A protein has these predicted regions:
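Alpha-helical, largely C-terminal catalytic domains
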Residues: 1-326
Length: 326
């Protein structure tokens, strides 16, 4: 039952080609207010990071990524989710522009912040040190609310923080997508669906549903690559993690042909997800929690597509020039 969200009509957007349902949290104004308040409180005013963060939310409450992606979340838990995701996004944005060796080392240190036994480790008096302190604080607050659910979030985050070490020159799109489904953060974001809604699944249920969530992870990686290529193609980095770039090099394709190819793969992957959804929901033995989870995975996918499709972060990407933010 959908208690916290309302549907969004996308029929007036002819190029919005997803078939996933799109919904938005009924408390979208409060979620937007909290998001902006957090950005102002944690980032230096007029800094590059501050401007880039604000740009993500420039279209107001109707385009808040949290309201769209976790549309059925408990509001109090949603605020902790926002704190957690904004911090991991900040780390990811910085790590993308760091040499790979540095990024892997910083990810390892951030990972240790999820475990109390490392709290005695000193932290530097800089931006990274502040992220470590914030991560420890968020960890404690999440555990206080739901310690069991926190373990699932922690384990998914740990896998994601270590994924950069597996990046390489991939031999095939299939090999790339097997890593990309983790690299894109799908396991973290889907664990947050369960955590924010109090959905408890057994280990057997999580194992049973994993092929479906992996299928969504592949779709999410392709969708993010397709939507973000315009932004990422000029990003200063020693590694480009994007399937458009991969097929351009693998098949010696011009850029537009590579973009069209990835769009085709994306559409076919969405079809696979929807077929699996229909098959799973047709099974009479599924628990109520499992049905709720599958339905909200579709909402999550639809909300993320809608946000990527319209967000200024991707439709009008900002400059990566350190002296500019537009």
């Amino acid at each position: 039952m959908d208690c916290n969200s309302v549907p969004i009509d996308t029929s007036h957007l002819p190029y919005c080609f997803t078939r996933f349902p799109v919904r938005i949290h009924k408390d979208k104004e409060e979620i937007q207010r909290f998001t902006l308040e957090l950005i102002h409180a944690t980032k230096k005013e007029d800094s590059k990071a501050h401007k880039h963060s604000l740009y993500k939310y420039a279209f107001g409450p109707d385009m808040n990524i949290y309201s769209l992606s976790w549309c059925e979340a408990d509001l109090d838990k949603m605020k902790l989710l926002i704190d957690f995701i904004e911090l991991t996004w900040a780390h990811d944005d910085v790590a993308e522009e760091e040499p790979l060796e540095n990024a892997v080392a910083e990810s390892e240190r951030l990972c240790r912040a999820m475990y109390e036994e490392y709290d005695s480790e000193p932290v530097a008096d800089n931006g990274f040190g502040m992220r470590i302190k914030r991560f420890r604080d968020i960890r404690d607050r999440m555990k206080a609310i739901d310690a069991v659910g926190w373990v699932e979030v922690r384990d998914a985050t740990e896998e994601w923080l270590h994924i950069d070490a597996k990046l390489k020159n991939f031999e095939s799109l299939e090999e790339y997508l097997n890593i990309r489904k983790v690299h894109v953060g799908n396991k973290i974001t889907t664990s947050f669906i369960r955590w924010t809604m109090g959905i408890r699944l057994s280990k057997a249920e999580l194992s049973f549903i994993e092929p479906y969530t992996d299928c969504i992870g592949v779709w999410l990686g392709l969708m993010n690559d397709y939507m973000s290529w315009k932004r990422e193609r000029t990003q200063p980095t020693d590694r480009v993690v994007n399937s458009v770039h991969l097929v351009m090099n693998k098949y010696n394709l011009p850029e537009e042909a590579a973009i069209d190819m990835i769009r085709g793969v994306l559409v076919r992957q969405e079809g696979k997800v929807l077929e699996m959804s229909e098959d799973l929901l047709g099974r009479t033995e599924l628990s109520t929690n499992m049905r709720m989870y599958i339905q909200n995975l579709e909402y999550y996918a639809g909300g993320l597509f809608y946000w990527h499709f319209l967000a200024p972060r991707y439709t009008k990407p900002q400059s990566f020039d350190p002296e500019r933010a537009d």
